[in-house]
């Protein structure tokens, strides 16, 4: 068992051999020690792997055919609260890793001018909302998301500092008849719009615009593959898009 694994590792460069002994390479060290590598590999194993068997069918139908390995939902977002515990853990580890690293700079941008009420669209488990209420002692944050996500958010923020200033507005954002709530100084969308088709994203933005007044600011943060500094980052994003197509909703990146 050790021999076949070491020989495979030798071929992919995670171990090296010298004087009939194996030792770890720099790439192997990063696989073991680098948090991003672990987050990505765990995510691929627990969320993506089995469902990717149905990628071709997904491309033909425009539906997340791979999602059936976990349950019968129109998109993965309705099913997040019902995923197997290990899959749910790795989903959120992946999701939080990439959002958490951007919070400090984003907070400075959003709160560069006074914000008393902020609408967090697609706020998921409330990580950004928590950051906002900890950063600013007065801001009230409302999370607009699916009812299932709102339930996860309530559990995640329960008893935490500022949780009394985090509110919920459950809604299916893909329903073009659902209006956005009004009266906000800022609207925040992070790693959100690229989860939908161009038509769906346009509908969301049109309804957001209709809810805004002349003083409302709209902030959108998205990772675009063709705006990356490093080639490897672009590679990772385009490959992750294949997962989103097969597993998330069948038509997104």
What name fits each language-model region?
Residues 2-116:
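Conserved Class I S-adenosyl-L-methionine-dependent methyltransferase catalytic core
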Residues 1-11, 16-17, 112-113, 117-253:
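Alpha-helical subdomain
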């Amino acid at each position: 068992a050790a021999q076949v694994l070491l020989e495979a590792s030798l071929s992919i460069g995670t171990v090296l051999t010298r004087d009939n002994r194996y030792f770890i390479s720099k790439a192997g060290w990063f696989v073991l020690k680098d948090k991003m590598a672990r987050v990505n590999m765990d995510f691929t194993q627990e969320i993506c792997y089995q469902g990717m068997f149905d990628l071709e069918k997904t491309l033909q139908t425009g539906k997340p055919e791979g999602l059936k390995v976990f349950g019968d939902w129109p998109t993965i977002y309705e099913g997040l609260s019902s995923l197997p515990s290990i899959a749910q853990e790795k989903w959120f580890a992946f999701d939080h890793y990439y959002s958490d690293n951007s919070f400090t700079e984003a907070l400075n941008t959003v709160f560069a001018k006074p914000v008393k009420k902020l609408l967090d669209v697609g706020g998921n488990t409330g990580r950004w909302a928590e950051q906002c209420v900890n950063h600013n002692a007065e801001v009230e944050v409302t999370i607009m998301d699916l009812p299932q996500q709102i339930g996860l958010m309530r559990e995640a923020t329960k008893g935490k500092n500022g949780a009394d200033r985090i509110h919920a507005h459950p809604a299916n954002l893909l329903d073009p008849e659902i209006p956005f709530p009004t009266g906000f100084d800022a609207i925040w969308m992070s790693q959100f719009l690229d989860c939908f088709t161009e038509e769906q994203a346009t509908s969301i933005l049109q309804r957001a615009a209709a809810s805004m007044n002349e003083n409302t600011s709209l902030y959108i943060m998205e990772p675009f593959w063709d705006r990356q500094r490093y080639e490897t980052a672009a590679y990772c994003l385009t490959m992750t898009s294949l997962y989103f197509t097969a597993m998330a909703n069948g038509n997104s990146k």
